[in-house]
From Swiss-Prot:
The chain crosses the membrane at residues 34-54, 66-86, 121-141, 207-227, 251-271, 283-303, 362-382. It is a multi-pass membrane protein. One of its GO terms (biological process) is signal transduction. This is Putative gustatory receptor 59e. One of its GO terms (molecular function) is ligand-gated monoatomic ion channel activity. Residues 55-65, 142-206, 272-282, 383-399 are extracellular. Residues 1-33, 87-120, 228-250, 304-361 are cytoplasmic. InterPro entries: 7TM_chemorcpt. Disulfide bonds: none annotated. It is found in: Cell membrane. Belongs to the insect chemoreceptor superfamily. Gustatory receptor (GR) family. Gr10a subfamily. It comes from Drosophila melanogaster (Fruit fly).
Length: 399
């Protein structure tokens, strides 16, 4: 099936959930705007009601961290709806720029990029929908198939969760397109490197044989021209990536913070469960583990997507250094390209100038995470010591 089919299907799901601009004009666009605002107000209302109805007696800091998920969800969904309603020209412009970059590829390379992107789109879309469908199923079982209770729970948990996951894909998919283009550059440089070497088994007349062979390959300056085109394309990729990060920066930062707080709370509650387990709550434990996997997966996915671009830049630098320099023009072109790549590597992109988006930042996230979880555990142990009895287990059952 054509790769664009899966891309269009994913965009249709995003539009239906009100987190991607409508591709229509006139009345249909206004209807989409009203639908997006309705979903936003529905989630906001449900989240506010959930906060007001939360009356479980637990330590204040624990209650604060637990309830922080709701305003976090409300803020991130509001940003996505804002993008969908008012940021349509920017989204359309970014799509055109990516198409412009891909148009510069040769026919076979272009088809390969679209094919690989279509396969990834199908994989991510299926994984996201199946995972959130499983969360809905566990929620239904947890509430003993009570329709309205399950409907209310899914409205404030799984619906915003699905919308935020799709929002992350809105950023990750175009960045993956850029990565695929850079991967094509890597393969072209690898082919050029092989072309510059004489066939295996050839008799070497002298020490300069390989250089002389490379001169024949570069006859007419074709190698220098190809590398110069790659340098220009890399510059465009850098600009487009920066534009996407500027557009999604605030959303990514809020998403990372929201996921970090949620992971802290879920880890603490799972610790409480295994401290004094009640196996009739095992379904809720599964729900906690799924929620933990979702938030942890989001943090890793956001950071790893950007690190792939960084890795490709390093691969390009390595291949450029391995090329046989056979003319002053080729040498100048390679040096300019290397300088551009090195400058880009030394200045990694940051979301809102706060979070460096690569997996090296993961150590900081883990450090903060463990500090908060240990702090919560110490509070719980301190309360038990003061009271002389175990805390009421009602702090486990609040979903």
């Amino acid at each position: 099936m054509d790769s664009s089919y899966w891309e269009n299907l994913l965009l249709t799901i995003n539009r239906f959930l009100g987190v991607y601009p409508s591709g229509r004009v006139g009345v249909l666009r206004w209807l989409h705007t009203l639908w997006s605002l309705f979903l936003l107000m529905y989630i906001w209302t449900g989240s506010i009601v959930k906060c007001l109805e939360f009356t479980v007696e637990i330590p204040t800091i624990e209650k604060l961290l637990y309830l922080m998920e709701f305003p976090g969800n409300m803020a991130t969904i509001a940003i996505l709806v804002y993008y969908a309603v008012l940021n349509r020209p920017l989204a359309h412009g970014a799509e055109l720029q990516i198409e412009r970059i891909i148009t510069g590829l040769k026919g076979k390379a272009k088809r390969l990029v679209y094919k690989r992107h279509g396969q990834r789109t199908l994989h991510l879309m299926a994984t996201t929908l199946v995972f959130h469908g499983l969360c809905v199923l566990v929620d239904v079982v947890n509430y003993d198939f009570e329709f309205w209770t399950t409907w209310s729970s899914n409205s404030v948990y799984n619906l915003p969760g699905l919308m935020m996951s799709l929002g992350v894909l809105q950023y990750a998919q175009p960045v993956h397109f850029l990565w695929l283009v850079m991967d094509q550059m890597r393969m072209c440089l690898k082919e050029l490197k092989l072309l510059q070497r004489p066939p295996q088994g050839s008799t070497k007349l002298d020490a300069c044989y390989e250089s002389a062979f490379a001169v024949l390959v570069d006859a007419g300056g074709g190698s220098a021209l190809m590398i110069e085109e790659m340098r220009y394309t890399c510059n465009l990729i850098e600009q487009v990536h920066s534009q996407f990060l500027l557009r999604f920066g605030l959303y990514l930062v809020l998403n990372l913070l929201n996921s970090l707080v949620s992971i802290c709370v879920e880890l603490y509650l799972i610790f409480n469960f295994f401290e004094t387990p009640l196996w009739e709550e095992s379904v809720l434990l599964v729900y906690r583990l799924l929620w933990l996997a979702m938030h942890g997966g989001r943090i890793w996915f956001i950071l790893s997507v950007n690190e792939q671009i960084l890795e490709q830049k390093c691969n390009l630098c390595q291949l450029l250094n391995e090329l046989e320099v056979c003319s002053s023009r080729l040498q100048r072109t390679i040096n300019r390209f290397l300088l551009q790549l090195q400058r880009s590597i030394d200045q990694p992109l940051e979301a809102c100038g706060i979070v460096t988006l690569d997996t090296r930042s993961l150590g900081g996230f883990i450090g903060v995470l463990m500090a908060i979880v240990i702090f919560l555990i110490q509070i719980g142990l301190g309360n038990k010591s003061l009271m002389g009895v175990a805390l009421n287990r009602s702090n486990w059952v609040y979903v």
